[in-house]
């Protein structure tokens, strides 16, 4: 009998990817295709939903072809996606009524301010675990219904459907048969009650959203449906589904309460598994659903985001032009023994958790005549580690769980200097796995578990392989002195822009 594989569809903000995994959890083949970003007005970000589905199907077919396997050798498909991005389409024609409004889009910021003035911030946080912000789906969906001609009337007649990107993919892959999402994606809409695990009637009324347009909410690991035969020539079960950061948490096998992963991308996404316990954050962390397995076992998570990580390195390269490529930062940082007292607070667009100061701005402080580009580069990399500690400290305090180890992935996790400094400033080991595609791997694991491709958690747990473990080498006194100065530098950047 021919060997079977799992196909993960990883639909991101700038590209669609398809990755095929074997039973050992190893990458057999990966295909990536970028698609256009649309900026119709300042602060607005959109995608064409047709680009999303076409690019995703294209890379899936190419991956099967490059791997030299037959479509019937795919045991299951797992889906993972950019979260919060909002799509509304016609139930009968499957045509979108408007472009996808992307998670980064700020067009509904003033709408959020109005709801804050009306005093709904606390209600929304208690029900959804989220802060009232344009980042999430609710106000994006309301904007489409309020601004696209005829949309609200059609929605009230039951003719329109809403979904995050996973729902749009599943709808199209199943030929319009399945309109569903999973608990992790639902928890990012600002319409889902994370306590009752249902769409919240009070919030639907508040945002004026007809309930009939919302998808069914299913476990992250269960059979959703089957691909339409015309796509791959055979029907393949779609069995795994989770938002990208939750999928990465699962792919890192952070399955025990207290386990934490950090994805170092443009920003950082730090998630802590809190088990079946909902931790109500008082310091601006998000409480979110990690995943729900088919046996209804539940994982909640705390999430903190750092706005500028890889973006800081990009600025060194493209703005200051003091490095030619991002990878140069490692040897430049290592070429000096410390940052010579220089601190870099990369508040280009304000600061995220736990400060939540949109009026903060970037600062490089502690400069003397002896300061060189190497010191500035080193301070920039160190800032990523300091910001991660800021989030992790709040997570530990609010969850009551002490961090014992940090698992890492994403582009900047390849930087050995940064990973060593991260271990030093946290005072705990940092573990980097051999498989860097942890988001796709998480979706693959969720799909494979649903069809028995992998037996259970313990089987996939054994597959997590260490590339390198960075042990802390800094003495506690130095660590705390450096961190104290970082906090001092941050206070200088807060509230810089006058309101």
Curated annotation (Swiss-Prot):
ATP binds at residues 13-15, 266, 310, 314, 411. It comes from the Bacteria. Keywords: ATP-binding, Glycerol metabolism, Kinase, Nucleotide-binding, Transferase. It catalyses: glycerol + ATP = sn-glycerol 3-phosphate + ADP + H(+). Pathway: Polyol metabolism; glycerol degradation via glycerol kinase pathway; sn-glycerol 3-phosphate from glycerol: step 1/1. Gene3D superfamilies: 3.30.420.40. Inhibited by fructose 1,6-bisphosphate (FBP). GO terms for biological process: glycerol catabolic process; glycerol metabolic process; glycerol-3-phosphate metabolic process. InterPro entries: ATPase_NBD, Carb_kinase_FGGY, Carb_kinase_FGGY_CS, FGGY_C, FGGY_N, Glycerol_kin. One of its GO terms (molecular function) is glycerol kinase activity. HAMAP family: Glycerol_kin. Key enzyme in the regulation of glycerol uptake and metabolism. Catalyzes the phosphorylation of glycerol to yield sn-glycerol 3-phosphate. Belongs to the FGGY kinase family. This is Glycerol kinase. It comes from Pseudothermotoga lettingae (strain ATCC BAA-301 / DSM 14385 / NBRC 107922 / TMO) (Thermotoga lettingae).
């Amino acid at each position: 009998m021919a060997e079977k594989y799992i196909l993960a569809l990883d639909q991101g903000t700038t590209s669609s990817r398809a990755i095929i995994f074997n039973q050992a959890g190893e990458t057999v083949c990966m295909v990536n295709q970028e698609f256009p970003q649309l900026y119709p007005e300042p602060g607005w970000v959109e995608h064409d939903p047709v680009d999303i589905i076409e690019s995703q199907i294209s890379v899936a077919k190419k991956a099967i072809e490059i791997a030299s396997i037959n479509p019937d050798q795919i045991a299951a498909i797992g889906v993972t996606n950019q979260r919060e991005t909002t799509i509304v389409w016609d139930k009968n024609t499957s045509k979108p009524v408007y472009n996808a409004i992307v998670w980064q889009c700020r067009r509904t910021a003033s709408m959020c301010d109005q709801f804050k003035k009306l005093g709904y911030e606390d209600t929304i946080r208690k029900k959804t675990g989220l802060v009232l912000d344009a980042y999430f789906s609710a106000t994006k969906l309301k904007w489409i219904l309020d601004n696209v001609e005829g949309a609200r009337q059609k929605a009230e007649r039951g003719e329109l459907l809403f979904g995050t990107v996973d729902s749009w993919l599943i709808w199209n892959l199943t030929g319009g048969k399945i309109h569903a999402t999973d608990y992790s994606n639902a928890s990012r809409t600002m319409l889902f009650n994370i306590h009752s695990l249902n769409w919240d009637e009070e919030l639907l009324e508040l945002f004026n959203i007809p309930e009939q347009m919302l998808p069914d909410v299913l476990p992250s690991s269960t059979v959703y449906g089957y691909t339409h035969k015309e796509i791959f020539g055979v029907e393949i079960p779609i069995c795994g589904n989770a938002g990208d950061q939750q999928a990465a948490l699962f792919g890192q096998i952070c399955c025990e309460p207290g386990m934490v992963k950090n994805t170092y991308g443009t920003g950082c996404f730090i998630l802590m598994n809190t088990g079946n316990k909902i931790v109500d954050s008082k310091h601006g962390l998000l409480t979110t659903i990690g995943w729900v397995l088919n046996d209804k076992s539940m994982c909640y998570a705390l999430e903190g985001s750092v706005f500028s990580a890889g973006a800081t390195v990009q600025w060194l390269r493209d703005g200051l032009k003091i490095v030619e490529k991002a990878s140069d930062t490692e040897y430049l940082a290592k070429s000096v023994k410390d940052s010579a007292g220089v601190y870099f607070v990369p508040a280009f667009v304000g600061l995220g958790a736990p400060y939540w100061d949109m009026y903060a701005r970037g600062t490089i402080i502690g400069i003397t005549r002896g300061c060189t580009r190497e010191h500035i580069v080193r301070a920039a990399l160190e800032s990523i580690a300091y910001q991660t500690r800021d989030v992790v400290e709040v997570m530990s305090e609010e969850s009551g769980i002490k961090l014992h180890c940090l698992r890492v992935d994403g582009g900047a996790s390849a930087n050995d200097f940064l990973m060593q400094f991260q271990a030093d400033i946290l005072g705990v080991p940092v573990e980097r796995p051999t498989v860097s595609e942890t988001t796709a791997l998480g979706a693959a694991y969720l799909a494979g578990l649903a069809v028995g491709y992998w037996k259970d958690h313990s089987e996939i747990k054994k597959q997590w392989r260490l590339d390198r473990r960075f042990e802390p080498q800094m003495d506690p006194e130095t660590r705390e002195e450096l961190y104290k100065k970082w906090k001092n530098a941050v206070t200088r950047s807060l509230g810089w822009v006058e309101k």
